[in-house]
């Protein structure tokens, strides 16, 4: 008798745990799961003839229908037309599902015969699904593959009405949904109830017993392929009570619930049909043919009492949290908040949530009208009378914002002033809502333009007087929702963090329900959703080249330090130069600030080595005058291209087409170093100048001071040098010093501003200097060109005819023999020099002083934006290569020349072969100082400047070379045959040799590698070196590391070695296929290399007896890495695939175990031996409800854990898959408790003691 009682009790216990899915499929379970009825008979029986399903067409399924009928009747649609459903093509199969969700995606697969779930990858299930029916040993069914946030999500679209009523879309804060990254339904990574879209894949014969969908959710169900048979039981009080008793009876497999319920209907769904199951309906499903179904679950506002009742049934029947609606009560709180916010315009969300989800307390003031982001609209979409109304309202600025806000939080005011304030606020809110409705394109199809409001009696007193009517279903449901949330104890209220004051929310909801108690149901059925998120303002995306706003007065002058508001644009990368193409150096102060390099991330700057040398205008830039973008690609000819290309002034920052300029008093000076940059004619004519730094590099430019090679200035000097060499061959030797200019000076001396250096000049970058001295002959030739360039530049500064005559005389003397090359070289040098440095007090140049032919020649030399960018990147790359090669070959150290005063800069020097020029000290205007003193001795500013000694050279400094990871090209594959001495190939092919090598030890393989080159490569095949053991190796040398990398092992043992962090980092960066790593006995400093984003996805990790590894270090080891590379957005732990973890001898606590539960969902073998802080509570934590380790744990080693007692064995009973428990040498665990554990588990799983306190499952 006693045995019978125990047996019955145990059977019931077994059945209860069917929700937990932790048991083995033992013989006892198989016996319990045998059905007591014939499923084939139930499919063909005609007894289930209830008439509950309503047949509809998609066009009739509208939001107005939902308001009228409340979604309480099952609906069947023969086609998807009119529903708004989007489905894949007809040839879509489960193999395509695998491709879109990932072949490694783990899914819960239900064994139909035992009603137990097992884990399979999608690849495994698809292989089973495609197996012929006769070859399937078991029936497997996938009913819980949620595919939101996968590629499959874009292929399947829900019915339109479902989107309109779903609480997830309309109640849950939007910014939380946008933060969801994890595609699986791991509760720890879930940001919202992720139950919107499911894929159900069933083979013929699958059966799911009677159930109610979790949380009382309603279900939409589209049969894409195959068919289904449903048994439906209506959710009457009697049926729900019967269903609850049936669940608790333990006889589900013996009783077909449809035979005992009040009414049951069997209905067969065919391919292409869509089914809607309301909340609370009890149903069972049979699959007559292999099927593929798409569906989803929703909670809505029209059947809330039934949803709450189903949730209570789940509480009483103790359904596992894994199979329940996630964040159920949190969702209920957000539902109340959204209704209160919509009806009273008062939000109970915290400020951060209001800002993120774009809900703000819309105060009836002018400021709120202009600042509310979700009320932004285009004025063009508004009617004329609305604009007039807006104008009347805006005439008087609102001064009562503070008063109205206080009125909002207080009781109603009965005074005359308060009434006037309410009236003004009402008008303003009506205007806002009207304008926002006109601009809300997404709501045009279902939202009426005359959107009613809630009355003034609501908690927010500044609302319009029109009433939003609620349906009777919504009123009844919201009332039940308030009562339910009030009745919950404090520890079960589950108030989300986004709700600021839950009690105030409940009070406001009660007030709203009182106000709407007498709502007219006919007026409420309007087809308009009451709660709806405001439309987000669309971000301005540049499609083609959008037009900017045209300035009303383009002739308005701006100061030199002020940018034009409509035309200023930040330049963007050219993406072609060497700087743009390289990676971060990781060593500059910008890199050290970046979060991925461990910094705080405050500077928000790119790496110094990646700062573009030729940034271009963004594609959104437009002309200030005409509002058009650049059109140089549409025309032919250099002159026409220049007139229609955008040019940005380096002084006033105006972006303009040269052809749009009306003033032609003076010509603009083009900056050859920066695309689309010049000094516009307006600034040039007015004599304005900007900072030398801006003129050197143009607006919005940052330069990397330690960039290898220099800018095009150096390249341009090289080209000038080559031209100069050709010129000098045609020239005769002439005097080095020309005649002196007469002593009479002009009244105005503009050269003072030239010679006197500005304070900003200190920011101008100095180029590299080398020890090689300049060639005197080449230097003499350079003086001739600089001499002419200076004179041409100064000609514009002299205003009197005498001054011009003197300058022309000197110029004619220099150019005694005219030459075409020099004629072209001089204007080029002049343009480049003026683009770098212009005279602060230079007067306007006269149009007649320069022939038109020279202007044409100069304009022909201006290239378009794209051509210049290509030229810049090409020449820079060549320069960098030349610089690096010369440094590598000659090993010259740069010598830094530092001027002793502000008047000096480094001069230019060139090498003897004429291939390279570098800067020595020169004058600010680009003229060599010696030549300047010889030409214009009277222009010297002060004796102090004249008597300056030559600059001294500082000691040589080592040049910092670039740090790049050099990836060698892939080596050729190993030969397939062994070449012999006579040139023939050996008869045995490579694969035969590989089979022989597989029998050799590693020591023998190393001997074979010495035979010949071919064997050397064959013996390094990674198939022969899956495991490498360096256990207790005294020293790890670089040669050993290279050998490991060459062999690419899957298992590496580095235990009890002195490997350093740098060595381990170098290894794991180059072993992507590494799966098993043993670092026991190493130091934490070395093990910390695993915290990098480059760590491979290990399966086994052994960190036993690691010195210094505690809870804080475990947190760093298990947390997601912080040094993600650009574009790497995976925020999961790099140890998420760990199945075996050995932590023996570590000083860790329960804090580390919580991290393991969170970040190691596949953990199967855990070694905590010799961990003195592990207690019974630790085991309780590992086996708690909802933890992944409760399902996955197979082996547990707790030997020598002195704080573990007999109580831990009761916790191990929760683990359905546990196979080995090692409690040896645990002082507080008795042998009798182990024997009792074996006896209690014998009904489910047979355990035995192979040694004392070593419990092992008997196979």
Swiss-Prot record:
Fe cation binds at residues 211, 213, 283. A zinc finger (PHD-type) spans 620-686. Residues 864-891 form a coiled coil. Residues 388-463, 536-562, 729-958 are annotated as: Disordered. Residues 536-548, 854-863 have a biased composition (Basic residues). Belongs to the JHDM1 histone demethylase family. The CXXC zinc finger mediates binding to DNA containing unmethylated cytidine-phosphate-guanosine (CpG) dinucleotides. This is Lysine-specific demethylase 2B.
């Amino acid at each position: 008798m006693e045995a019978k009682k125990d047996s019955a009790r145990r059977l019931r216990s077994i059945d209860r745990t069917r929700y937990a899915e932790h048991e083995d499929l033992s013989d006892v379970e198989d016996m319990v799961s045998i059905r007591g009825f014939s499923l084939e008979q139930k499919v063909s029986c005609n007894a289930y003839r209830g008439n509950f399903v309503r047949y509809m067409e998609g066009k009739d399924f509208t939001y107005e229908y939902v308001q009228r009928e409340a979604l309480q009747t099952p609906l069947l649609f023969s086609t998807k037309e009119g529903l708004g459903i989007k489905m894949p093509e007809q040839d879509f199969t489960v193999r395509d599902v695998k491709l879109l969700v990932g072949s490694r995606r783990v899914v819960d697969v239900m064994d139909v015969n035992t009603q137990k779930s097992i884990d399979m990858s999608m690849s495994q299930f698809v292989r089973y699904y495609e197996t012929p029916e006769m070859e399937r040993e078991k029936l497997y069914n996938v009913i819980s593959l949620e595919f939101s946030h996968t590629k499959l999500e874009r292929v399947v679209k829900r019915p339109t009405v479902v989107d309109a009523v779903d609480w997830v879309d309309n109640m849950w804060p939007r910014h939380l949904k946008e933060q969801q990254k994890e595609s699986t339904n791991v509760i720890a990574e879930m940001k919202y109830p992720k139950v919107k879209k499911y894929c159900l894949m069933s083979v013929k014969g699958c059966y799911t017993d009677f159930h109610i969908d979790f949380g009382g959710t309603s279900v939409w169900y589209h049969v894409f392929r195959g068919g289904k048979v449903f048994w439906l039981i209506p959710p009457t009080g009697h049926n729900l009570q019967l269903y609850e008793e049936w669940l608790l009876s333990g006889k589900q497999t013996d009783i077909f619930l449809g035979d005992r319920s009040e009414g049951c209907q069997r209905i067969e769904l065919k391919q292409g049909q869509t089914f809607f199951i309301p909340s609370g309906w009890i149903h069972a499903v049979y699959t007559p043919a292999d099927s593929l179904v798409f569906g989803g679950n929703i909670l809505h506002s029209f059947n809330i009492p039934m949803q709450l009742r189903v949730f209570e049934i789940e509480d009483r029947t103790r359904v596992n949290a894994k199979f329940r609606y996630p964040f159920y009560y949190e969702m209920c709180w957000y539902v109340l908040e959204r209704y209160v916010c919509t009806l009273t315009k008062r939000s109970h969300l915290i400020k951060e949530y209001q800002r993120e989800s774009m809900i703000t307390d819309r105060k009836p003031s002018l400021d709120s009208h202009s600042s509310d982001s979700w009320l932004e609209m285009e004025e063009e979409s508004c009617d004329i009378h609305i604009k007039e109304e807006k104008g009347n309202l805006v005439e008087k600025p609102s001064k009562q914002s503070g008063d109205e806000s206080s009125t909002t939080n207080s009781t109603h005011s009965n005074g005359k002033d308060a009434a006037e304030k309410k009236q003004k606020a009402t008008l303003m809110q009506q205007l806002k809502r009207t304008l926002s409705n006109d601009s809300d394109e997404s709501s045009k199809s279902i939202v009426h333009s005359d959107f009613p409001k809630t009355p003034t009696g609501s908690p927010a007193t500044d609302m319009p007087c029109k009433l939003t009517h609620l349906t009777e279903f919504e009123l009844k449901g919201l009332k039940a929702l308030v009562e339910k949330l009030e009745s919950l104890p404090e520890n079960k209220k589950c108030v989300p963090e986004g709700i600021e004051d839950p009690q105030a929310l409940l009070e406001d909801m009660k007030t709203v329900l009182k106000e709407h108690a007498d709502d007219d149901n006919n007026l409420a059925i309007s087809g308009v959703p009451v709660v709806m998120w405001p439309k987000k303002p669309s971000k301005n995306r540049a499609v083609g080249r959008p037009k900017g706003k045209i300035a009303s007065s383009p002739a308005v002058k701006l100061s030199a330090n002020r940018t034009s508001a409509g035309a200023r644009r930040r330049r963007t990368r050219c993406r072609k130069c060497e700087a743009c193409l390289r990676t971060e150096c990781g060593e500059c102060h910008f890199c050290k600030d970046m979060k991925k390099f461990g910094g705080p991330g405050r500077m928000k700057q790119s790496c110094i080595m990646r700062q573009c040398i030729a940034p271009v205008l963004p594609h959104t830039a437009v002309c200030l005058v005409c509002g058009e973008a650049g059109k140089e690609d549409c025309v032919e000819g250099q002159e026409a291209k220049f007139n229609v290309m955008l040019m940005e002034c380096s002084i006033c920052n105006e972006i303009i087409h040269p052809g749009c300029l009306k003033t032609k008093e003076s010509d603009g000076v083009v900056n050859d170093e920066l695309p689309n940059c010049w000094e516009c004619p307006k600034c040039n004519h007015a004599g304005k100048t900007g900072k030398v730094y801006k003129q050197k590099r143009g607006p919005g430019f940052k330069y990397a001071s330690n960039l290898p090679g220099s800018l095009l200035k150096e390249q341009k000097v090289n080209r000038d040098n080559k031209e100069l060499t050709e010129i000098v061959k045609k020239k005769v030797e002439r005097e080095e010093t020309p005649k002196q200019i007469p002593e009479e000076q002009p009244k105005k001396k503009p050269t003072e501003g030239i010679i006197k250096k500005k304070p900003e000049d200190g920011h101008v970058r100095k180029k590299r200097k080398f020890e090689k001295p300049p060639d005197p002959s080449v230097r003499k030739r350079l003086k001739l060109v600089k001499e002419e360039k200076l004179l041409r530049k100064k000609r514009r500064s002299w205003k009197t005819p005498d001054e011009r005559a003197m300058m022309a005389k000197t110029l004619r003397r220099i150019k005694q023999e005219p030459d075409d090359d020099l004629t072209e070289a001089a204007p080029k040098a002049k343009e480049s020099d003026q683009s770098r440095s212009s005279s602060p007090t230079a007067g306007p140049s006269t149009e007649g002083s320069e022939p038109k032919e020279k202007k044409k020649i100069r304009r022909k030399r201006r290239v378009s934006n794209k051509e210049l960018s290509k030229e810049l990147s090409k020449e820079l790359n060549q320069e960098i290569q030349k610089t690096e090669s010369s440094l590598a070959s000659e090993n010259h150290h740069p010598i830094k020349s530092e001027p002793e005063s502000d008047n000096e800069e480094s001069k230019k020097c060139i090498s003897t072969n004429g291939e390279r020029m570098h800067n020595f000290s020169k004058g600010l205007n680009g003229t060599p100082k010696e030549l300047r003193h010889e030409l214009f001795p009277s222009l010297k500013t002060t004796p102090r400047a004249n008597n300056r000694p030559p600059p001294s050279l500082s000691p040589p400094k080592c040049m910092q070379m670039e740090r790049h990871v050099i990836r060698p090209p892939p080596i050729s594959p190993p030969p397939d045959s062994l070449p012999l001495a006579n040139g023939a190939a050996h008869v045995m092919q490579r694969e035969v040799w590989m089979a022989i090598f597989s029998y050799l030890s590693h020591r023998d393989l190393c001997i074979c590698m010495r035979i010949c080159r071919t064997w050397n490569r064959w013996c390094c095949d990674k198939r022969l070196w899956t495991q490498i053991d360096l256990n207790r190796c005294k020293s790890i040398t670089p040669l050993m590391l290279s050998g490991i990398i060459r062999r690419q092992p899957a298992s590496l043992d580095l235990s009890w070695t002195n490997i350093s962090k740098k060595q381990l980092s170098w290894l794991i960066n180059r072993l992507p296929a590494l799966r098993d790593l043993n670092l026991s006995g190493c130091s934490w400093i070395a093990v910390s290399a695993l915290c990098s984003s480059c760590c491979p996805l290990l399966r086994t990790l052994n960190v036993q007896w690691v010195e210094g590894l505690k809870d804080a270090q475990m947190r760093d080891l298990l947390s997601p890495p912080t040094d993600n590379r650009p574009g790497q957005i995976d925020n999961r732990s790099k140890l998420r695939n760990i199945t075996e973890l050995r932590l023996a001898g570590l000083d860790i606590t329960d804090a580390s175990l919580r991290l393991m539960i969170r970040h190691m969902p596949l953990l199967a073998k855990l070694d905590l031996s010799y961990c003195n802080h592990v207690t019974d509570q630790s085991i309780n934590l590992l086996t708690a409800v909802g933890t992944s380790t409760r399902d996955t744990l197979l082996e547990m080693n707790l030997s020598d854990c002195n704080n573990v007692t007999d109580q831990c064995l009761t916790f191990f009973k929760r683990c359905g898959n546990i196979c080995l428990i090692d409690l040896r040498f645990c002082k507080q665990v008795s042998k009798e408790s182990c024997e009792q554990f074996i006896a209690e588990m014998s009904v489910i799983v047979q355990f035995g003691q192979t040694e004392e306190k070593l419990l092992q499952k008997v196979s």
